Amino acid sequence: MGKKMDDLISIVLPVYNGEKYLRESIDSVIAQTYQTWELLILDDCSTDRSTEIAKEYEARDNRIHYYRNEQNLRLPRNLNKGFSLARGDYLTWTSDDNRYKPQAIEKMHAALVSANAQFVFASCRIIDGDGKEVEYIMVNEACKKKIIGMNPVGACFLYTRKAFEAVGEYDPELTLVEDFDYWQRLYTQFGAATLEEILYEYRWHDGALTSTMRQNTFNQTLEKVLLKNRAAFGKIDAEGTYYYYRGLYNCRKKLNDENNPYKKKYRLYSFWYFVRYRVPRKIARMMHEK
């Protein structure tokens, strides 16, 4: 049976003053082994050469479409605009400073089709501003358990139009964690497939979460998301509860809250997790090494 390569994949690329790495990002889409795609570049009022670069690519490839907002929408609304224009059977988005590996779209699409799944995510390599490897975000089946309290998805993912229509738009009130909120909403409705292979390069550089105010906003909003989506997970076991309270505890810890309301439950479930999982795994490794 041959590979199914005719489903249209819509890739939304939000841009804001991304001239430095934009060509690398677009080139990584063009280099995909899966060629049935459309790239929608959503320019959120850039003041650098992003417009010029995007229009250059649009003129060269009729699969690339450039749109410029009349006013700055910020990321969640910009994504929503992009997906409202998308025509694909499968949807994803990337960033103006990140890069796909050549087989990323093909392998994620194949994973969804073969597993009859609605949402898939894959491992990423983290690179610095010069493109040098820093570390990895590794994905496996076990990591899905973490999604109730922390983000295992990374930046390499694909989901179906069916899932998009069921889950709806990205929440414009959740800037900085709009993606994690969306992954939780997708996961609670459809579950997820995973790919351990590294299919994406995610760039850490000076534009990341640097200011204290931005970090505080991130952790405050993340706590809000964890509390908001908890009920959708239904009944969870003790391991899931550990990850949930670990996420909440870390939010308050990073906000320097001396009266962290999640401390007791986090410590309780941390102890349980250590005894139930960490100790047996360590013993198993020691026995294997003998």
Segments (PLM) and residue ranges:
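N-proximal low-complexity "stem/linker" segments adjacent to membrane-targeting elements
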Residues: M1-I30
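C-terminal subregions of glycosyltransferases and related glycan-biosynthesis enzymes
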Residues: G2-K4, D181, T188, R203-K290
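Cell-envelope/extracellular polymer assembly enzymes that use nucleotide-activated donors
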Residues: D7-S10, E38, D181
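A conserved acidic beta->alpha catalytic loop
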Residues: Q35, D43-E52, Q71, S95
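Glycine-rich, basic loop-to-helix element that forms the pyrophosphate-binding segment
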Residues: N69-A86
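Conserved nucleotide-sugar donor-binding catalytic segment
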Residues: S84, A122, Y136, E141-V225
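Short aromatic/hydrophobic "clamp" motif used to bind/position activated sugar donors
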Residues: L91
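Conserved donor NDP-sugar-binding/catalytic core segment of glycosyltransferases
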Residues: Q103-V134
